[in-house]
Amino acid sequence: MKILVLSDSHSSMRFMRLCVSKVKPDVIVHLGDHFDDGEALNEEFPHIRFYQVAGNCDRYRTPPHAREILVMPIGGVRFYMTHGHIHHVKQVLSLLMRDAREAEADIALFGHTHMAYCERETDGLWVMNPGSCGYNRGSAGLIEIEAEKITSCRIDRRAHV
């Protein structure tokens, strides 16, 4: 299973479409800023499972069903998804990691900083920020799952995945 992770699109639809066309993911995750970009992408690719959370720039543009945190299994792996602003990820990652561990997540996904990051902690928790796919930064994350385990977790910063 391939999961495409996007964040901080800030109305940059072209790169997101390119990623979806190239990767052909089974699942798309959009981590906020801008929520309506995610909704538009979901409408363009309705056959692909889609999850998204709201970011700090989405305060006045999100529907009532929008969430700031989603915790759920995908492919047998437990995901903790948030934009990150409520965890103050520009200063520290410890609050995000604490909440992800309390939720018994296998991987924590966040955005907000526009800086790509992907590491596996000593206790096995994966932590990923795909960077910004907006502002011509061209950064995205790709997670691969086989047999209910993460087999690959990587960032691509070259405007294609």
Q: What name fits each language-model region?
A:
Residues 65-69, 91-99, 125:
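Charged helix-capping and loop-helix junction motifs
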Residues 15, 74-75, 101-104, 121-122, ...:
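Binuclear metal-dependent phosphoesterase catalytic core
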Residues 10-14, 35-39, 57-62, 87-92, ...:
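Active-site environment of divalent metal-dependent phosphoester hydrolases
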Residues 15-19, 81, 87-100:
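Pre-active-site segment of Zn-dependent metallo-hydrolases
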Residues 5-7, 27-33, 51-56, 80-83, ...:
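Active-site neighborhood of phospho(di)ester-bond hydrolases with catalytic His/Asp-centered motifs
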Residues 49-90:
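Helix-adjacent hinge/juxtasegments
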Residues 1-47, 58, 62-67, 138-139, ...:
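N-terminal active-site segment of His-dependent metallophosphoesterases
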Residues 46-49, 124-125:
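A short helix->loop->beta-strand "cap" motif at the edges of active sites that frequently abuts
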